[in-house]
Regions:
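Metal-associated gating/positioning segment near the N- to mid-region
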Residues: 48-50, 55, 63-122, 140-146, ...
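Generic structural signal for hydrophobic
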Residues: 92, 154-155, 176, 180, ...
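Active-site-adjacent beta->alpha loops and helix N-cap segments on the catalytic face
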Residues: 107-114, 167-181, 222-233
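Active-site neighborhoods of metal-dependent hydrolases
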Residues: 138, 151-161, 218-289
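Divalent metal-dependent hydrolysis catalytic cores, especially in the metallo-beta-lactamase
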Residues: 88-109, 125-135, 156-168, 177, ...
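Histidine-rich, glycine-flanked metal-binding segment
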Residues: 9, 15-66
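Histidine-centered divalent metal-coordination motifs
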Residues: 6, 63, 69-77, 190, ...
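Divalent metal-binding pocket/active-site signature
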Residues: 144, 161-204, 213, 258-260, ...
Length: 289
């Protein structure tokens, strides 16, 4: 048992802050939220929930409490990032992130094991939803609709929560998303420039994609007079800074906000219940060590 005492609660449903309250948590579930008085007035101990033997309590007087944050696009990272999962998990937890959608990177078996340990409280970590990179683990490049459907079924059998796409031939994307939707799993797509000229956000949404990631694919769906963005002569897709640098210029090539085409795209995405996951982040991350 855990009791968080005297905190001011912001519960996330649009209601204003309220406190002081004592919040009782047992076995990963909030059992009760108990009003224990009024601001500036001494709290009567008789009005407070009692702590069970072996339980813990936190004095949160003067503090605010919110529900855990959900990070819809959080990479656990790998050797190239120089951090092990434990370090990443503790950073997330320290910043209030209690659920994370892990969109590809580590293999499905490793993510499933971390997810299991988190669920069983064997490690300090958020709840994990693992999305496998499309084609990850396949013996060869997926080149037919049948191979796409077979891989999707195998991914579901392996216990993944969904798929992270980067783009593929249109018929392969259609087949994979159709099969994935039949199985009831989630899907996300970073519409990489390598495929976006033939398959943008509108194509994905119509085919059943759950969410787009970053900005990729949306301005291309808003193009009116072109299919391919205006790449500078020295552009190199493998240089991520080129991609980021051209992103702002890309929007300037799209339909103007609230124009007919802009509104048509927006309204269709809303009608399809499509999710935009923009993953806002800082451009420079550094620490004074």
């Amino acid at each position: 048992q855990l009791i968080i005492r005297g905190v001011t609660l912001i519960n996330g449903d649009g209601s204003p802050p309220m406190g002081p309250v004592d919040i009782v948590v047992e076995n990963n579930t909030i059992l009760s939220i108990n009003g224990v008085g009024y601001p500036g007035i001494e709290i009567k101990e008789s009005d407070r929930p009692k702590l069970k033997k072996g339980g813990k309590e936190l004095d949160a007087n003067g503090m605010y409490l919110l529900p855990g944050f959900i990070d819809m696009h959080g990479h656990i990272g790998g050797a190239s990032q120089g951090a092990n999962p434990e370090y990443v998990f503790k950073l997330w937890m320290a910043h209030g992130i209690t659920t994370v959608r892990q969109p590809s990177g580590r293999g499905v078996k490793e993510v499933n094991e971390l997810k299991r340990k988190s669920k069983n409280n064997e490690i300090v970590a958020p709840r994990i939803f693992g999305y496998t990179g499309f084609g990850q683990g396949a013996k060869k490049t997926i080149s037919t609709e049948q191979e796409a459907r077979a891989w999707v079924r195998e991914n579901a059998k392996n216990g993944a929560d969904g798929i992270k796409f980067f783009g593929a031939e249109p018929e392969i994307m259609s087949a994979a998303l159709d099969e994935n939707q039949k199985l009831g799993l989630g899907s996300a797509c970073h519409h990489a420039q390598l495929s976006v000229a033939r398959w943008n956000v509108l194509h994905s949404a119509r085919a059943g994609l759950t969410s787009m990631e970053h900005w990729y694919g949306l301005p291309e769906a808003l193009f009116e007079d072109r299919t391919v963005q205006n790449y500078p002569l020295d552009y190199n897709y493998k240089n991520e800074q080129h991609r980021f640098e051209e992103a702002g210029k890309l929007w300037a090539q799209a339909a103007k906000p609230f124009s007919k085409h802009w509104n048509n795209v927006m309204n269709e995405l809303i009608a399809l219940d499509f999710t935009l996951d923009p993953t806002f982040n800082i451009y420079e991350a550094s620490r004074d060590l």
